[in-house]
UniProtKB/Swiss-Prot annotation:
Induction: Constitutively expressed in high-iron medium, whereas expression is reduced approximately 2.5-fold when an iron chelator, such as deferoxamine, is added to the growth medium. This is GATA-type transcription factor SRE1. InterPro entries: Transcription_factor_GATA, Znf_GATA, Znf_NHR/GATA. It comes from Ajellomyces capsulatus. It holds the Pfam family GATA. PANTHER family: BOX A-BINDING FACTOR-RELATED, TRANSCRIPTION FACTOR GATA FAMILY MEMBER.
Length: 630
């Protein structure tokens, strides 16, 4: 292997002066080439020859490669002049493959110049045919097939014209101004792509910039716009905002434009600021972009024609619909805007807020008026009530007097008392489970209305439901002081004390299943019947009380046989008063309930008999009709 390396080095040293036979003689076979590469890399510390295929890339790059070679030769000449020629020749003698692969006329070169040239060829030698750049995130093709960069391609696609290579534009130059010609000449002389001889390349945009002669702040408003502002809703007007944006951008460019002029800079001293003073002189006014067709400066949207010239929205739409340019006679000084444009909310003074609340302003100011009314309404609520608690944010537009409906829990229905005209509630039963104003089991009357008088008691919050659950056992303990209806049966009285404290509700399910007591049941139904319409009590009472009546007589046994007399006289039930009530006051109430029950049952029986008789007569009439039809 050592002999092979020595022979290869001698062969390369012998053919190094010649450049044409370098590549064919260096690769006799693939095995020899691999072995030589391994030996060279191991002997020289793993250094690779980056210029082995430079000749191949030279054929692919063409004209772009010639420019890079010229740059490399200039860099090499500068290095030779600085005294680096001797070290370069020594390094070239030590590495014959690098010297043999160098396509430049000079046989020796430094190691830094090939690396710099390889970085310049990162995109395989592509260059933009419009601006000449060699670096871009995306290479594009022009309609003619030329290679262009991403910026030039997007510019051409959007404006249908080539992207200008010089970025200095005299957009703030009035017509017929001598300073404009001076700035154009100075700018064209400093541009790398314009030598000042071609008048078409000076700046085409300066032809579309006109002087603004309309006084600012004279917009009539109300849907009409002249682009000057000063009216209600001008902050949200697209024509006004577009015009302000364009003028601000051009004023910023005007501050930096005269500084690049060599004529202005050579004047020296105070004369060097004449360009800035001239551009900011109020006599020249603000310059805006103008339409190529009608020369207007006010439009909600700037468009471009097929030549890339800026045109207003009206001319662009007219050309798009009719295929011809819009006649200049159709130009109007005021633009009619649609009502769908929402203006920006501006701070209003108190008089304007008063007008907006009365609805006397234009529709454009309605959003700002609503916002101001909303704030004033919230302030009025805080001042009027003076409680230091602002209204909830979820309902800012409702009156503060409207309270949220309390929770509706029908399981605690017995703890609430319904106030009726003929049955006023007692003071001991006025319990407020939703109030926190009870101390040691004692209740106090508050100003809050009962729950059934509220508007929408269907929803409740989590806090209110938790308060209700915590207060429900206390309410059940307070109700235990109600006097018992049937003293001889303590279990029934204790179980019936809670569900019967509210006369407006039937017994609970537990009391119906466990049959708490005869007298208690009759008394409850008696009070229920007194609250029901008399016309309906006779129909409802027998259905609900018939099973209880049978249970009552079964429990009485042989003490009193049941009597079903249609008579309305209260004398016969006196025989049953002693066994049921035991001679107490509760027994008298039970007797009255039995009498009412018998009277209702008799009325029910008589009505059923009448209905049955009517049905029989109707059936006979239908049978006669059938007989006649047959």
């Amino acid at each position: 292997m050592t002999g092979l390396l020595a022979s290869r080095l001698r062969a390369e040293g012998a053919r190094s002066p010649t450049k044409g036979t370098d590549i064919p003689m260096r690769q006799p076979s693939a095995e020899d080439l691999d072995a030589a590469h391994q030996l060279v890399s191991s002997a020289r510390g793993g250094r690779d020859n980056v210029m082995n295929f430079r000749s191949d890339r030279q054929e692919m790059t063409g004209k772009a490669l010639d420019n890079t070679q010229g740059d490399g030769s200039r860099n090499m000449d500068s290095q030779l002049q600085n005294g680096h020629k001797a070290p370069v020749e020594q390094r070239a003698g030590e590495s014959p493959p690098e010297s043999g692969a160098n396509p430049i006329d000079h046989p020796t070169s430094s190691k830094k110049s090939p690396k710099a040239q390889s970085k310049e060829q990162a995109f395989t030698g592509h260059s933009c045919s419009n601006c000449g750049t060699k670096r871009t995130p995306l290479w594009r093709r022009s309609p003619t097939g030329a290679t262009i960069c991403n910026a030039c391609g997007l510019y051409l696609k959007a404006r249908n014209t080539d992207r200008p290579t010089h970025r200095s534009r005299s957009l703030l130059t009035p017509y017929g101004s001598s300073s404009a010609q001076t700035l154009d000449k100075s700018r064209s002389s400093t541009s790398p792509t314009n030598d000042g001889n071609d008048p078409r390349l000076t700046d085409t945009w300066s032809n579309y910039a006109v002087k603004e002669c309309t006084p600012s702040g004279s917009c009539p408003g109300g849907g009409s716009c002249n682009g000057t502002g000063g009216a209600e809703g001008c902050d949200g007007c697209p024509a006004y905002n577009n015009r302000v944006y364009k003028s601000a951008a051009r004023n910023a460019m005007a501050l930096h434009t005269p500084r690049t002029s060599p004529q202005v800079s050579t004047q020296g001293g105070p004369g060097s600021t004449e360009g800035d003073a001239g551009s900011s002189n109020p006599e020249t006014m603000t310059l805006h972009i103008a339409c190529q067709n009608c020369q207007t400066t006010v439009t909600p949207l700037w468009r471009r024609d097929e030549n890339g010239h800026p045109i207003c929205n009206a001319c662009g739409l007219y050309h798009k619909l009719h295929g011809a340019y819009r006649p200049p006679t159709m130009k109007k000084s005021i633009i009619k805007r649609r009502k769908r444009v929402v203006p920006a909310m501006r701070e209003q003074s108190p008089p304007s807020a008063t007008q907006s609340s009365n609805g006397s302003v234009s529709p454009e100011a309605s959003p700002a008026a609503l916002a101001h009314n909303h704030d004033s309404h919230r302030q009025y609520q805080n001042v009027e009530h003076g409680n230091g608690h602002p209204p909830p944010h979820t309902r800012p537009l409702y009156s503060h007097a409207y309270h949220a409906p309390p929770p509706a829990d029908f399981t605690g229905y017995t703890s609430n008392v319904i106030s009726l005209p003929h049955h006023p509630p007692s003071t001991s039963q006025q319990l407020r489970p939703y109030d926190n104003n009870h101390n040691n089991g004692e209740t106090t009357n508050t100003h809050r209305a009962p729950m059934p008088a509220l508007h929408n008691p269907k929803k409740r919050t989590i806090s209110e439901s938790s308060i209700e659950d915590s207060q429900r056992p206390q309410a059940s303990q307070i109700l235990t002081h109600i006097p018992q209806i049937n003293p001889p049966t303590p279990p029934s009285s204790s179980s019936a004390s809670f569900p019967n404290n509210n006369p407006g509700r039937f017994n609970s399910i537990s009391s119906l299943l466990n049959h708490p007591g005869e007298a208690a049941t009759v008394t409850a139904h008696d009070r229920d019947d007194s609250r029901v319409d008399p016309a309906l009590s006779s129909a409802v009472a027998p259905r609900t009380q018939q099973p209880q009546q049978e249970h009552q007589h079964a429990s009485a046994g042989s003490h009193s046989p049941p009597r079903f007399s249609p008579s309305l006289s209260p004398a016969p039930p006196s025989t049953t008063a002693v066994p049921v009530g035991g001679g107490s006051g509760s027994g008298a109430a039970a007797v009255a309930g039995v009498v009412d029950h018998r009277d209702a049952k008799a009325e029910r029986r008589a009505r059923l008999q009448r209905e049955a008789q009517d049905m029989r007569e109707a059936l006979k009439a239908k049978e006669r009709e059938l007989a006649l039809l047959e």
